[in-house]
Amino acid sequence: MLISLHELVKKYNIIFNGILHVGAHECEELNDYNKYITNDKILWVEALPGKVELCKTKFPGINIENAIVSDKIENVVFNVSNNGQSSSILEFGLHSQYHPHVHYITAFEGTTTLLKDILPKYNINYNFLNFDIQGAELKALKGMEEYLNTVDYLYTEVNSDYVYKNCALITELDDYLKQFSLIRVETNWTDCKWGDAFYIRENLLNK
């Protein structure tokens, strides 16, 4: 995370009821989350089966789902990168220019899932979201639209240009989230046209 979770908690008085983390990778944020919330109130979602099994081994008992999430159910090709963290349903755009050492080494076919079909399996009030799925964040959010009016906080990777082909740009995310009263209050950019942003429910500002 480019923006410190602990700094966000202090600055915005974040209260965690439940966390949905999409793009688990190896659950690197788990220790930070556990300062505020227990594992039974966290749901992780990860597209790579090998990473899901690794997380289950490292952190027995966590809630984790193996799923490729999007805004509609369809068959897709999921691209796997040599660094793991750049894997995506989207093709590289400017990513290849800024990170020439990273490339896709294999791919597999899979069927996408809507988050709204996963979330009811768990007794969690998901008020804090963390999305890091390489340009597909808006697609995933649209797949759980029914839940967004009860979300208080969203931490997400964002793009100012097409780091991945046809990825959502930050202005599109801003416009979409505004209709759910989620307002961007923090942004931290890298030099490679991508970064992290933090959105908060408007009525929680200045509380």
Please identify what each model-predicted range represents.
Residues 1-207:
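Phosphate/nucleotide-binding beta-alpha loop and adjacent structural elements of enzyme active sites
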